[in-house]
Amino acid sequence: MPKTPIPLPQVRTVGLMQPMTWLVLAWRDMARSGWISFAHGLAITAFGGAILAVAHHRFWLLAGALSGFLVVAPVLATSLYALSRALEQRQEANLGVVLKTWLNWQNSHLNKWGNDYWCMVQFGALLALAATGWVITSAAFITLLAPVPVKTPMDFMRHVVLANNGWLFELWLGLGSLLAAPIFASSVIAMPLLLDRRASLRVAVLTSWQVVVANPLPMAFWAALILGFTLLGLGSLLLGLIFVMPMLGHASWHAYRDLVDASSLPLRDAAVATGQRSGVSS
C-alpha cells in the first residue's frame, strides 16, 4: 500500500524584498523588549568570545568553530522567537517569557522523551551534531591542504584567502556552502514552528523545505542577509553580534508568521492559546 502523505501546514509565497520587512519588525521588537533582547546578543557574543579565547592560536580550528557556532544559532534564538510571539499577542516580553521557554515546558514533560514535546531538544542536538561535523571537516581541510600551518587570522588571510596558487579558499567556501544549504533549508522556520505549534520534527523540517522551494529568491535573499549581517558582527570583533543576533532572531519569527499558516496544527500549550485569545480580543 502506498504511504499516506504527511499533512503539512499551508505555505505562503512572499515578495523578494519581504525579508527587509522582517528586519524592520525585528528592530521594533528589540525596542519594545528592551534589555532582554540585547542580553541574548551579549550572551551569544560572550560565547563566541570564549571560542575565540580557546582557539585563537589554532585558527585552522577557529574558522570552523565560529562558522559552526552559527549553525546552532536557530536553537540559541528560541527565546527571542518567544519574545516576539508575546509582543504579537500584546503580552509583556520579559524575563519570565525567556525562563518559561527554556525551562518550564521541558520540565513538565520530562517523561515524554520521543514525542513532539522534545522535538526542539532533538532538533538542537541534530544542529549541534552538524556544527561539530563542520568544525572537524573544516579543520581537516585547512590542515591538510594549506601550504603552511595556519595558526593565526593573518596566516588564514595570507595562505588561504589571498593565496596566489590554488583554490583553497574557494574550495573551503564551496564546501561550507554545500553543507550549509540543506541546514538552512531545514531550519529556516523549523524552530519557530516547533515553539509555536505541536508538530513533529519531520513536519517542521519538511515545512521548512517547502517554504524554501516555494520562495527560492526571497529565501536566497534572506540567507544572504543572514550571512552578511553575521559577517559584520564577526568582523567587529564579535561586538556587532550584540545587535545582529537579536535582530535575526526576532526577524526569523516574523519570517515564520509570513511564510507559514500553521492554524491547522494545535498550539504548543494551553497558556499560549489563552494568550492568543486575549491578545486578539484586546
What is each model feature region?
Residues 1-282:
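Hydrophobic alpha-helical membrane segments
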